[in-house]
Each structure stands twice: as structure tokens, then as C-alpha cells.
Swiss-Prot record:
Quaternary structure and interacting proteins, as annotated: Homodimer.
Protein name: Biotin synthase
UniProt keyword annotation of 4Fe-4S present: yes
Pfam families the UniProt entry points to: BATS, Radical_SAM
Role, per record: Catalyzes the conversion of dethiobiotin (DTB) to biotin by the insertion of a sulfur atom into dethiobiotin via a radical-based mechanism.
Top-tier EC class: transferase
GO process terms (BP): biotin biosynthetic process
Binding site for [2Fe-2S] cluster: 97, 128, 188, 260
Cofactor(s) for this UniProt protein: [4Fe-4S] cluster; [2Fe-2S] cluster
Keyword Iron: yes
Membership in a protein family: Belongs to the radical SAM superfamily. Biotin synthase family.
Reactions the enzyme catalyzes: (4R,5S)-dethiobiotin + (sulfur carrier)-SH + 2 reduced [2Fe-2S]-[ferredoxin] + 2 S-adenosyl-L-methionine = (sulfur carrier)-H + biotin + 2 5'-deoxyadenosine + 2 L-methionine + 2 oxidized [2Fe-2S]-[ferredoxin]
Length: 350
């Protein structure tokens, strides 16, 4: 499989409609051509500024426009961020991601953000941030501080985007990705499944990502976590097989990228996660919570890895002795209703 940047909707739909086993087989072949087998990269995500976001993303409990249980918090102190990063490293994460609920960062915050980046880098961890839209100059400042990855999701197809967000355009998102790439950073960009979009919209999202001049180094595929108070709290459940298919198609279309299981993994049982790994997912967020929604505990992750013979990629420096199990103690407590296991997939133990 060669790396391509000229995918059409018709070609993607053809992949999506392949027999399930054939699709997973092809995706796993592509995966092994470009990536080590049985290895998964592990990241930890910390909300460094929570709530009161002025945007209207219909899926997000951090929007100031919706009545959710998320309480707003100021930008976290640098020392607390570094403390959380050290705990994440101790628990086995290789990349530390910092997220702020902003439309875009203010200039007054840039020195604090660059201090966070430098401090985390000094620990031997890779760094990632998601701060909203960036100007070219802000992207250069973050890159100069040593930021490895910048996350800015496209969320969905251009055609469906206006049904989800109106406070920034699709082109705004593409422009930020261009600024990030021009500054020399790696891109983390994906989308969310389960917001009422059609199969064509899911194909359209992957076409946009795969036809970028350079594929994102990391492609997070999120399954919507429905949060009370947001406009999407009653969205229809995602069929697990459809989600797994999308993981496989993303792997085939972007063979060199890391495909990450991101938000929604708390609502996937072991069998579903296993098929996602078979389909080519090779990166996860580890333990505790993703910004304001739950994530499987690190113990459960390691138990599953042991069952499957998966090894998480190690940090570049030897982790210190683990003294605490609690990570990300500043993240807002869960506000998402968790579906039951039976609603999500079959139980292989029966």
C-alpha cells in the first residue's frame, strides 16, 4: 500500500462497504507494513483550562452556551501541570497532551504555555497541545518552545460541519493546521463519530484528512460521549461495527499515521477495543479522563494489553518509581452517562 493524497468519496465508500473480515485483514496488512506489530503508543491528556469556552460545538460540555455540570477553571499553574506530567510519565505515558477550552489562546498566556512545554520536554516526554485556533506567530512560538504535536480536529465533513459548529469555519481549522505544519510541528487531527452524520460524512472526514499535503502524524477517532445539557445528549448510538470499520479505513488511507482510540473508549468493552486494534488503531489515551469525560483506568488498559500481548511504547527516560495511582486530579469529574456493556457489543465470555 502506497501513501496517497488523492482519495475520492467513491473509493472510501467502497472500502467502508467491504465485507467486515476482509476489511480488517487488509487494514492489518497495511498496519504491519508501516508499524511494529503489537505495539501501542500511550498518551495522557490534561485539561489545563476548563469550561467557559465561547464556542458552540454541540458535542462539548465545556461550551459556556450549554447548562452542564462542568465548572469553569482558570489556566492551571505551571507547577501543577508539571506535577501531573511527572505522574503520567510514572504511569507509562510517552506523550503528555495539554488542552485548554479556548477559541484561541491570548497573548498574555503564551509565556505560561511555553514554560509548560519546556518543563514537560525536560522530563523526556513528547508534548502536545490543543488550544483552539492559532496565528502563524503563535504556532512559531509553540514550536520554538519545543512543542512536538498540535491537536486541531476537523470533527466531521465540510458538508455536515455547519450542523455542529457555527463559531468557526472549516477553513479556519484548515488554516490552523497549515500554520502548525509551516512552523515545523507535527499534526494531530481527526474527528468525532456519532453526531448524527451520515456514512458519506464519515467518508468525507477521512477524505479531508487523507488528502492534506502531508497526512497528520496522529489521527484520533473519537466516539461521541453524550453529555447531559449539550445539544447532542440524545444522539443515536454508534453501531460498534461501523466504528471499527472507520478505524480500518483510516488505517488503509493513512498508513503511516498513528490511529488513536480517543474519547468514547470508556464505553467500549474489551472485545470492541480488541477489534479496533486489529483494524489498525495503535495509540490510546491512558487512564483517568479525557478533558471532561471518562477514560478507562490504567489498570484496565494494562490488563487488556497483557491479554492481547500488546506492549505499550516506553518513555525515552526510565520512569521513576510509581508512588500514586491518581492522575490528572484537576480534571472535572465525569458528567457523561455511561451506556451498559450489553448496549455496545457482544460479550465474548458468554
Amino acid at each position: 500500500m502506497e501513501v496517497r493524497h488523492n482519495w475520492t468519496h467513491a473509493q472510501v465508500r467502497e472500502l467502508m462497504e467491504m465485507p467486515f473480515m476482509d476489511l480488517l485483514f487488509e487494514a492489518q496488512q497495511v498496519h504491519r507494513q508501516y508499524h511494529p506489530k503489537n505495539y501501542v503508543q500511550v498518551s495522557t491528556l490534561l485539561s489545563i483550562k476548563t469550561g467557559a469556552c465561547p464556542e458552540d460545538c454541540k458535542y462539548c460540555p465545556q461550551s459556556a452556551r450549554y447548562q452542564t455540570d462542568v465548572e469553569k477553571e482558570r489556566l492551571m499553574e505551571v507547577e501543577r501541570v508539571l506535577d501531573a506530567a511527572q505522574k503520567a510519565k510514572n504511569a507509562g505515558s510517552t506523550r503528555f497532551c495539554m488542552g485548554a477550552a479556548w477559541k484561541n489562546p491570548k497573548e498574555r498566556d503564551m509565556p505560561l504555555l511555553t514554560d509548560m512545554i519546556k518543563g514537560v520536554k525536560d522530563m523526556g516526554l513528547e508534548t502536545c497541545m490543543t488550544l483552539g485556533m492559532l496565528t502563524p506567530e503563535q504556532a512559531k512560538q509553540l514550536a520554538s518552545a519545543g512543542l512536538d504535536y498540535y491537536n486541531h480536529n476537523l470533527d466531521t465533513s465540510p458538508e455536515y460541519y455547519g450542523n455542529i459548529i457555527t463559531t468557526r469555519t472549516y477553513q479556519d481549522r484548515l488554516d490552523t493546521l497549515s500554520h502548525v505544519r509551516d512552523a515545523g510541528m507535527k499534526i494531530c487531527s481527526g474527528g468525532i463519530i456519532g453526531m448524527g452524520e451520515s456514512a458519506n460524512d464519515r467518508a468525507g472526514l477521512l477524505v479531508e484528512l487523507a488528502n492534506l499535503p502531508t497526512h497528520p502524524e496522529s489521527v484520533p477517532i473519537n466516539m461521541l460521549v453524550k453529555v447531559k445539557g449539550t445539544p447532542l445528549e440524545t444522539a443515536e448510538e454508534v453501531d460498534p461495527f461501523d466504528f471499527i470499520r472507520l478505524i480500518a479505513v483510516a488505517r488503509i488511507m493513512m498508513p503511516t499515521s498513528a490511529v488513536r482510540l480517543s474519547a468514547g473508549r470508556e464505553n467500549m468493552n474489551e472485545q470492541m477495543q480488541t477489534l479496533c486494534f486489529m483494524a489498525g488503531a495503535n495509540s490510546i489515551f491512558y487512564g483517568c479522563k479525557l478533558l471532561t469525560t471518562p477514560n478507562p483506568s490504567e489498570d484496565k488498559d494494562m490488563q487488556l494489553f497483557n491479554k492481547l500481548g500488546i506492549n505499550s511504547q516506553q518513555v525515552s527516560q526510565k520512569p521513576d518509581e510509581i508512588t500514586e495511582n491518581e492522575l490528572l486530579d484537576r480534571v472535572v469529574e465525569s458528567v457523561a452517562a455511561r451506556p451498559t456493556k450489553d448496549d455496545l457489543f457482544y460479550d465474548a465470555s458468554l
